[in-house]
Amino acid sequence: MTIFNNYEVWFVIGSQHLYGPEALRQVTQHAEHVVNALNAEAKLPCKLVLKPLGTTPDEITHICRDANYDDKCAGMVVWLHTFSPAKMWINGLTILNKPLLQFHTQFNASLPWDSIDMDFMNLNQTAHGGREFGFIGARMRQQHAVVTGHWQDSQAQKRIGSWMRQAVSKQDTRHLKVVRFGDNMREVAVTDGDKVAAQIKFGFSVNTWAVGDLVQVVNEISDGDVSALVDEYESSYRLTAAAQIKGDKRQNVLDAARIELGMKRFLEQGGFHAFTTTFEDLHGLKQLPGLAVQRLMQQGYGFAGEGDWKTAALLRIMKVMSTGLQGGTSFMEDYTYHFENGNDLVLGSHMLEVCPSIAVEEKPILDVQYLGIGGKADPARLIFNTRTGPAINASLIDLGDRFRLLVNCVDTVETPHSLPKLPVANALWKAQPDLPTASEAWIVAGGAHHTVFSHSLDLNDMRQFAELHDIELTVIDNDTRLPAFKDALRWNEVYYGSKR
């Protein structure tokens, strides 16, 4: 995806006319230097665009209004270079509906001990200008992030880049369309929910299309297009004997390719970037979409099984956040456990649909095997193990009066034994702080059995996401203790209840 090329982040300097034109000229020069350097050296995902100084209430309000109506503007970074009386910002911040970050920095890294005078002090007032801005944000209950550090500091730059990813993701989510092919898996609770509340809170829309509508598009795909895609399969994957030319399951591979092309065409024509399927509603499809879903996820689409639109949307959101980062992000499900004293493990997988972006560095196997669920022909799928290292599992649930985001930090490990009879992609991990604590906390908090699994993102990314969307965050990591965790759930119930 090249989604970051579609957006920019505005860089606004707060000041005032009290200090005279020469001071404002220097402020402008400093701002130009900082923005140019950050764009050139900081490896930011988005371009920073310097806007005119904000020195009066009208100027600031004009900038904020323009930001709202500029589709390319993903958010605004504010630097209080000098003292900028915060009452000047009230009208602008009242109408601003784009993400906001205060960069609490200054032009110089060190103090000029021998030459510092009051002119220098008046020009470089971030230390208390930023506090004035922070007060009005707190007074207005304005959600905003703060990053402190010198503009040349790599950690400060990294944090700004991380926030930019959140800002772009939020803008993308406002336009996100999720299509459900068929309805929710029958009688399942956690995959259901309030789609209207979700659209109000996050911006994405969720609607259902009959599987027959998809089948019609699938059937329109030409044999030539199918053949070209299968050639791509041949070069990208290790095909088993059954899946190769003259193999007894070769037709299943061709059918899977036709389904992939049809699904992608349907998604593109409808402007959808996330989707769900359900094995209970496959009328007209020759097989449960497995390979198609895996490859579409790798291209940046959100997906979840059994009609789980919340997880599908969350996967798309996290795919956008993690664009260009190392690792991968996938639909996942806690499937089964390995209980061993001191070495409890979780084997994660799904019937078919795990994204190859999390695979180890080798070509996945493309195979066709029996699937008892769904009642269709044997589906094609990619089989692989997952990279090792730190990861997260995230789940978005609907509690009726609010949305809760659960995040469990995990450590992905190598599979200690081969799995010769398991014909699906999988991941093996240790849950933090341990499996009993993590699973009990997850269950008590209502976490779903479907998750988004990511090597690319971490807890800080999801914390920013929750803050930006003003939703509850529940964390399970090495610091989690069940009594305190349960207390936090009770406190959250009171806090969010008071906000209704």
Swiss-Prot record:
The keyword Isomerase applies. Pathway: Carbohydrate degradation; L-arabinose degradation via L-ribulose; D-xylulose 5-phosphate from L-arabinose (bacterial route): step 1/3. Its cofactor is Mn(2+). One of its GO terms (biological process) is L-arabinose catabolic process to xylulose 5-phosphate. It comes from Enterobacter sp. (strain 638). One of its GO terms (cellular component) is cytosol. This is L-arabinose isomerase. The keyword Isomerase applies. Homohexamer.
